[in-house]
A protein has these predicted regions:
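Double-stranded beta-helix
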Residues: 1-19, 123-149
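A short, N-terminal "cap"/entry segment at the start of jelly-roll beta-barrel domains
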Residues: 1-67
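Short Gly/Pro-enriched loop/turn and capping motifs at secondary-structure junctions
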Residues: 84-86, 119-121, 140-142
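A short beta-strand-loop-beta hairpin characteristic of the jelly-roll/cupin
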Residues: 80-107, 145-147
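Conserved metal-binding segment of the jelly-roll/cupin
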Residues: 102-126
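A short beta-loop-beta micro-motif enriched in histidine and acidic residues
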Residues: 62-77, 85-92
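Residues at beta-strand starts and edge strands
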Residues: 50, 75-77, 93, 130-131
Length: 149
């Protein structure tokens, strides 16, 4: 392959998420199937790359780490994206998400911005009529969290 100044920025493979490595397996006990987990510049291969996780929601449920309210020292987007080409704003599912002490129900394509230091979660998937995308990203390079006390 030719040498390239920018080839390292095309990320096609990432390690599994350490908090729930089984989520890469389609038939795991996790409600989603992970595709990308970018943290720490993909083990230093892409310095400066922001934190990113992409998943496809396949079934109902939650994970222990998403049951606990937590904060980050970076701002984070939580994106819920419908996949119906006839109505891409219909999530075809229902997600319960807590931000601070507010419980919200998500049934439409939604972007939630969570400022640094704001507690969020639990996140519980109550209904999946059609798989939809769940993407999280933040303006930090390393994923870290602190459980809310």
């Amino acid at each position: 392959m030719e040498q390239s100044d920018y080839g390292k920025f095309f990320i096609t493979e990432t390690p599994r998420h350490p908090d729930h490595p089984q989520s890469r397996d389609r038939d795991s006990d996790i409600p989603w199937c992970d595709t990308f987990y970018v943290s720490g510049g993909v083990n230093g291969q892409v310095p400066g790359a922001y934190y990113l996780e992409t998943c496809m929601m396949l079934r109902t449920g939650s994970t222990p780490d998403l049951q606990v309210p937590h904060t980050h020292d970076f701002g984070e987007y939580l994106l819920f994206l419908g996949t119906d080409p006839d109505d891409h704003f219909d999530l075809h599912g229902e997600v319960e998400l807590w931000v601070g002490d507010e419980k919200r129900t998500i049934t439409r394509t939604t972007a939630v911005f969570v400022p640094a230091g704001v507690p969020h979660c639990p996140l519980v998937v109550h209904r999946v009529d059609r798989p939809f995308m769940f993407i999280t990203t933040g303006d930090g390079t390393d994923y870290s969290r602190e459980e809310d006390k």
